[in-house]
């Protein structure tokens, strides 16, 4: 029994969506397969993306004992005025800068920790 591929394709072209859906279900049942697209290993890709993170948010978690020094450091890092910098410090935990490089984030963290603040990089 030879297959006439062109005849099958022509017959599929003339079929309705419901008929084609029934055909897919019948093929799935008969051959034990699924028409669903295979899903790539998303868990592994997600872990790689987290390990290779290239932009960070610098978050001031706690201000410590030296509030004035922390405010000065925040002003230096962010370029904000005294009132805005004080507002960020008073409302800790707060995000100081977003989408910064790893090196820049580490530098900011070091400056703030030097004056007694607790900083998280996210």
From Swiss-Prot:
Domain of life: Bacteria
Alphabetized GO MF terms: mRNA binding; structural constituent of ribosome
Protein's GO biological process: translation
NCBIfam families attached to this UniProt entry: L12 (TIGR00855)
HAMAP family assigned to the protein according to its UniProt record, in alphabetical order: Ribosomal_bL12 (MF_00368)
Family according to the record: Belongs to the bacterial ribosomal protein bL12 family.
Record-given protein name: Large ribosomal subunit protein bL12
Organism in which the protein naturally occurs: Latilactobacillus sakei subsp. sakei (strain 23K)
């Amino acid at each position: 029994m030879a297959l006439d591929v062109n005849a099958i394709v022509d017959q599929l072209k003339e079929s309705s969506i419901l008929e084609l859906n029934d055909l897919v279900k019948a093929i799935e049942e008969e051959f034990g397969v699924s028409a669903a697209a295979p899903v790539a290993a998303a868990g592994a890709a997600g872990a790689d993306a987290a390990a290779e993170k290239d932009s960070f948010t610098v978050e001031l978690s706690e201000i410590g004992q030296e509030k004035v020094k922390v405010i000065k450091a925040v002003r230096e890092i962010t370029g904000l005025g005294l009132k805005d910098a004080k507002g960020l410090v008073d409302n800790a935990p707060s995000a100081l800068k977003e989408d910064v490089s790893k090196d820049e984030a580490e530098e900011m963290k070091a400056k703030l920790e030097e004056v007694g603040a607790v900083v998280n990089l996210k």
